[in-house]
């Protein structure tokens, strides 16, 4: 059985979509934080957004790497 060749042509687009979705989730969660009175819920939501912020940093680093690889022809 042959393995599929590594097709990275759409990686930058997929990562950008993940960035966009994560930013949207952060905004939605911030709205939930503003609209809840329960401190436990607020703390949980804030922690979730902290993890999302960390993921955004990773996505941004990854998208730079992929863009450089794309310029070099993925070699």
Curated annotation (Swiss-Prot):
Q: Give one Pfam family.
A: Tlp
Annotated InterPro entries: SASP_thioredoxin-like
Cystines in this chain: none
Q: Which family does it belong to?
A: Belongs to the Tlp family.
Name of the protein this chain belongs to: Protein Tlp homolog
- Organism (species): Clostridium acetobutylicum (strain ATCC 824 / DSM 792 / JCM 1419 / IAM 19013 / LMG 5710 / NBRC 13948 / NRRL B-527 / VKM B-1787 / 2291 / W)
């Amino acid at each position: 059985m042959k393995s599929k060749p590594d097709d990275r042509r759409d990686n930058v687009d997929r990562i950008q979509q993940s960035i966009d979705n994560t930013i949207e989730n952060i905004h939605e969660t911030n709205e939930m934080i503003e609209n809840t009175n329960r401190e436990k819920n607020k703390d949980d939501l804030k922690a979730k957004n902290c993890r999302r912020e960390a993921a955004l940093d990773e996505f941004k680093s990854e998208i730079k790497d992929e863009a450089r690889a794309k310029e070099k022809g993925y070699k």
